[in-house]
């Protein structure tokens, strides 16, 4: 930990830190950190993930700016190890490239080729990062992952500022870090798999199964799919088994899971509370009921995209549009309940015009929601 002291001091005083992580997440729910890579003040550091990095995490949370490329898994890992969330100082070069028209999910390798005209190999992606010592190839690969990252960021920031997009990108990066930090209450986990086609009874079965699976995954530190895959849960809801024999023969469930937890799975599916305790059936998503308004919505998005020179798929996502439509239909009026992305810089130029379009359509449409 004494060797980390000068690195921590640099992180605290630097204007920008380039970061990446190498980890293993094959048979566990939580990632196992192998290496934390940091490029600060012209120096690249490869830090052993098995060390106590509490002070490093704190320094990164307090830093002026942390640069990542495709930060999702990295910051999720940081949240887990640091025990705090969310980060509020992230600049993601992948997000920046999307704003500048390179595409939404440009790889680091492709980003370096397109922006810096540098070619790097990605031959250690599936390497064992928990092995000690690391091979020379692993060390070189890990170092390269952050060596060019600050230069890439600076080139992109220059372009973003010329287009007046820089603040937009910082805002979207912040919203993304908040999204990754969100943790659903365990009793609401089932909503990630629920849809409007499920009956209230099926939603109750799903809720009980999802809570049980989540608790067991945490207890065993195993991926949820190792216990029950999502498509198997769907099959269990569609054709509810009554016996252990049916559970063994009709579904692709691991024998060990059936052996140790089969009876409990059957109970969760068949022993339900009173119907009054069932979850309310989900309404059909409003976006499916607005087919005749779809052209107007797409035209407005295309218009704003052209005016701002920002790709349409960056301006609006299906998830946000669905949430916006629901918000308008429920006549909520509370802007704070809108998706974060729909507020901020998008609000005046896109969200408000779309609200008017959707509201006009809903005024002439009668919805019925069945339970």
What are these regions (language model features)?
Residues 1-110, 114:
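Conserved RNase H-like, two-metal-ion catalytic cores of nucleic-acid enzymes
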Residues 2, 72, 143, 227, ...:
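Conserved phosphate-coordination/catalytic loops
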Residues 13, 42, 84-85, 118, ...:
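Short, well-ordered coil loops that connect the C-terminus of an alpha-helix to the N-terminus
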Residues 26-31, 99-100, 132-135, 236, ...:
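Short, solvent-exposed polar/charged micro-motifs at secondary-structure junctions
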Residues 65, 69-165, 173-181:
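Internal, well-ordered alpha/beta segment that forms a basic, Gly-enriched binding/recognition surface
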Residues 136, 156-371:
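Accessory DNA-binding and partner-docking regions appended to nucleic-acid-acting proteins
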